[in-house]
Amino acid sequence: MAGFMYAPYNVYQGYGGNFGQNPHVAQPLAKNKQAAWKSNKASEPTDYLDNFQRAQLKAILSQVNPNLTPRLRKANTKEIGVQVNPRVDTGVQCSLGPRTLRRPPPPPCSPVKAADCVRFTRPLAVYSPVVDRRLFSLPQGGRLPKKSPDSQSQPLKERAPSPEDKEREKVSEKEPDTKDELEKRPVPGTEEPGNEEQTKSAFQFLEQKYGYFHCKDCKTRWESAYVWCISGSNKVYFKQLCRKCQKGYNPYRVEAIQCQVCAKTRCSCPQKQRHIDLKRPHRQELCGRCKNKRLSCDNTYSYKYIV
């Protein structure tokens, strides 16, 4: 009985006598022994109470005192301790003995670059979605260094032009220029060498505006639908001859949506030069002659179908 009562506190190795010994009898002092996982590298786990003995012990303890319960059985695990130090190789102490985890050799360090040097990708062309695989980096200050004529001439001398480069130069020379680019291009003699960097190619975008057809030569005026104009202006982009007389150049016009007399959007003039519907300001009549006719200004017609 006494052995069962004191069994939970001395069944483990290193915590007292063996199972079933009388605790009142003086026992010889145990020598300080090294732990089992230090002395024996491959020691078997200690045999604990089996399920039958544990159930029997629990029943006896419940009769003596309901509050007395057997000590929880130690899990069948292996103790392990890890030394964590980022500067030293990690040392692991387990039941197999001391082990050392070697750190993998670090990769070769790349040379430190300046922090201001930002690298990014850039497209191959102005509106091209294809991105150049080479990384483009700006120097300090965000401006490209100016190349002297001597530095530009040296690589040209070293590398001979390939036949592909010659073909590209021929194709670029044969590309036709638009009228707007020819008008904006300065005369070769008047351009200064210092202004070459400041000159930039001007890009023009188109937008649709509601316009009309008016030929001054044959006095023909028709309503038209939307006209392609240069954005921010009333200049018609697609210029052509009059379809009736084939003399008037660029008959398509775009007017401001306002009265021609008072120059207001909401007109209150008693007498007007010609009928202007402010709700539809570009649908204009000439002296009312087109009313109730097949091609009247009240209907919308596109200039593409007017002959």
Curated annotation (Swiss-Prot):
GO terms for biological process: negative regulation of translation; oocyte maturation; translation. It is found in: Cytoplasm, Cytoplasmic ribonucleoprotein granule. Changing residue 259 to A: Abolished binding to the 3'-UTR of mRNAs. Pfam families: Zn_ribbon_3CxxC. It comes from the Eukaryota. One of its GO terms (molecular function) is mRNA 3'-UTR binding. mRNA-binding protein required for maternal mRNA storage, translation and degradation during oocyte maturation. Probably promotes formation of some phase-separated membraneless compartment that stores maternal mRNAs in oocytes: acts by undergoing liquid-liquid phase separation upon binding to maternal mRNAs. Binds to the 3'-UTR of maternal mRNAs, inhibiting their translation. Belongs to the ZAR1 family. Disordered regions undergo liquid-liquid phase separation (LLPS) for the formation of membraneless compartments that store maternal mRNAs in oocytes. The 3CxxC-type mediates binding to the 3'-UTR of mRNAs. This is Zygote arrest protein 2.L. It comes from Xenopus laevis (African clawed frog).
